[in-house]
Design a protein with these regions (language model features):
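Mixed-charge, glycine-rich, non-catalytic linkers/tails in nucleic-acid processing enzymes
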Residues: 182-183
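Short Asp/Glu-rich motifs
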Residues: 92, 140, 174-175
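A short, structured active-site edge motif that brings together acidic residues
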Residues: 130-140
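Conserved non-catalytic scaffold segment of RNase H-like nuclease domains
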Residues: 4-131, 144-166
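Acidic, divalent-metal-coordinating active-site segment for phosphoryl/phosphodiester hydrolysis
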Residues: 167-179
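Short, glycine/acidic-enriched loop or turn micro-motifs at the edges of active sites
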Residues: 31-33, 137, 174
Length: 183
């Protein structure tokens, strides 16, 4: 086990707190755009990791109750037709709370994913608060000197294959792989 001394700016979680007995909710969201206040989630994936292995997972398309811009459909492959009969966020909110309760919210650029999940809960009148951990910041500290810390570059660097980029479950599984290398 590697031990590093630093605090992540996005949270109060330090590398010393990374251990093989904590629960981590590794999450990715796909959205209708880049600003959580104005845009909505179209897909969410959560993979629970106990510090040693994956223990549970959840993934679903979500009906954002608005049109998905063409540029987003081109990027993610998620279309209005695909989400037309998908659940709305409020229909899966309880499951998201239950899966992430007591877990550290882990994402690649955590401020993006966390802000969208938090904003969706705020629209429902609920505060969503979790400790957060950013795999971008972690990777910069643990693997210094890489030309880029984007998920696609880390996948290339570590030889991680993924079926489809910009789909929540595939990106989350790639994040799990990066996360395990950091642990």
């Amino acid at each position: 086990i590697r031990v590093y001394c630093f605090i992540f700016a996005a949270s109060n979680v330090s590398v010393q707190e990374l251990n093989h007995s904590a629960l981590y909710a590794i999450i990715d969201v796909e959205t209708t755009g880049g600003q959580a206040r104005y845009e909505r989630i179209t897909e969410i994936a959560i993979v629970l990791h106990d510090g040693q292995r994956v223990v549970d997972s959840f993934s679903t398309l979500l009906n954002p109750e608005r049109s998905i811009p063409w540029s987003i459909t081109q990027l993610t492959g998620i279309s209005d037709e695909m989400v037309a009969n998908a659940p709305r966020f409020f229909e899966v909110a309880k499951q998201i709370v239950q899966m992430t309760e007591g877990a550290i919210f882990v994402a690649h650029n955590v401020s993006f994913d966390y802000s969208f999940v938090r904003e969706e809960f705020a629209r429902l009148g609920f505060a969503y608060t979790r400790k957060q951990l950013c795999t971008v910041r972690m990777a910069r500290k643990v693997f210094p000197g890489l030309p880029s810390y984007s998920l696609s570059n880390l996948k290339r660097h570590f030889g991680i294959s993924a079926e489809r980029s910009h789909r929540a479950l595939d990106d989350t599984l790639a994040r799990v792989n990066v996360f395990e290398r950091i642990l």
